[in-house]
Amino acid sequence: SLTFRMIPYADPRSGLKRLRDGFALDWGVLGIGEPVARALRQEVKGLRVFPGLAGPACSVPSTQQGLWCFLRGQNRGILFDLTERIRSLLGEAFVLDDAMDTFFYADGRDLSGYEDGTENPCDGAAHDAAVVRAEDGLMGSSFVAVQRWEHDLERFRSYSSDQRDAIMGRRAETNVEIEDAPASAHVKRSAQESYVPPAFMVRRSMPWQTAHQQGLEFIAYVESLDRFERVLRRMIGADDGIVDGLFTFSRPVTGGYYWCPPISGTRLNFSSLGI
């Protein structure tokens, strides 16, 4: 996962044109942040800056950048080469601000040991949740919310298995949802079908680790950022003062919103950016 910031007063057009023409679709996913659209004096309807939020004894930071990439590769050598290629395409108007390698853990589990993304929509429902259907240059595009969460696994492991299950609202061993889980359980705070209208998202959580920290990179693809934001506000207790149990051992340290442009033929379509 890469984020790039724009150099103040730099013109991003030439770099974005090279990126449009040179970004191979099998490299991964590309997202454009509101600062880039603003610099181009273009409006991408529905795109906005990630909000910094606060709730009872918890907070959600905004670290909005100009561009985000989620690259795929079988090894770090491939990812290194792709990163260098993107930096070369972007040129001097963008600077790599952050890079985090993520990985697949224990059959798709979070580092806490619990399965994640269990209730992702599938097939047509996934398309409806994540893909914009507007009759303009946005058709076929998507919006994405990206957060990095940092876990305190030592604290989490100090809880009993029942306490850990109550935080998540699921049994770790069976992944079965606990019917009488507390209102603060993550499955209850984030139940996408409980919103009006429903807030279904196509979510992906990828573990990460450095020498002294670890956690998950949370990625949610949506046809409208309102879907993600409604869930996030409930998680911090903005609706009823009840904070998601995740905050007992984890906290978000980054947050950004991005627009993933549609595809025309074999390349990205930047027409909504005037490019």
Over which residues does each language-model region extend?
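Long, histidine/aromatic-enriched segments associated with O2/redox biology
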Residues: 1-275
